[in-house]
Amino acid sequence: MDASLKIVIVDENPIRAAILRDGLHEAGHVNVTHIEDRNGLLARIYAIDPDVILIDLENPSRDVLEQMFQMSRVVKRPIAMFVDQTDTASIQASVDAGVSAYIVGNLQKDRIKTILDLCISRFNAFARLQDELDRAKSALEDRKVIDRAKGILMKAKNLTEEQAYALLRKTAMNENKKIADVAQSVITAAELFK
């Protein structure tokens, strides 16, 4: 694991924060910032721009949990959340919010490195899946646009589907554009003439 990682610890309890900090230092991580007060937390996290965020909440209220979950949805970083007690709804909410590791139970410094590694690995795996999903959605949208443009060309120029696609492809190559961009231009032009 990269020892130069910027890590933020969010913990109102200095004793518990020290356990996290000691565990990180023993694992070779020295670039660690402790945020004790949660007021203005999001702005402070953006200012620090950490690689990983560790949040220790001990026994959080529903409001505090929801505040942390909202923050985790926005920051798009590996987040490990430590709590002493939990329930099924909180676990599900943490997963939905994108928390990479939700750790329940005793906070022990010798577990911090493993938890950090797990947190980063799960975040990266989820990010890869999200990227694949985004690419698949984009390809599907492109396919829909291309199909619609082919239909317009087939009707307007009395072409077969293959001929319409070949025309889109040739135009895209000549203009050094993506086929989907040319297809969108065809759709836009057709809508102007309605």
Task: Describe each PLM feature range.
Residues 89, 107-116:
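C-terminal output helix
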Residues 29-37:
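Short hydrophobic/Thr-rich beta-strand motif most characteristic of the beta2 strand and flanking loop
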Residues 134-194:
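C-terminal output/effector regions of signal-responsive regulators
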Residues 17, 38-42, 51-71:
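Conserved phosphotransfer microenvironments
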Residues 53, 77-86:
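A short, hydrophobic beta-strand element within the central beta-sheet of small alpha/beta folds
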Residues 3-15, 20-24, 53:
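Conserved acidic segment of CheY-like receiver
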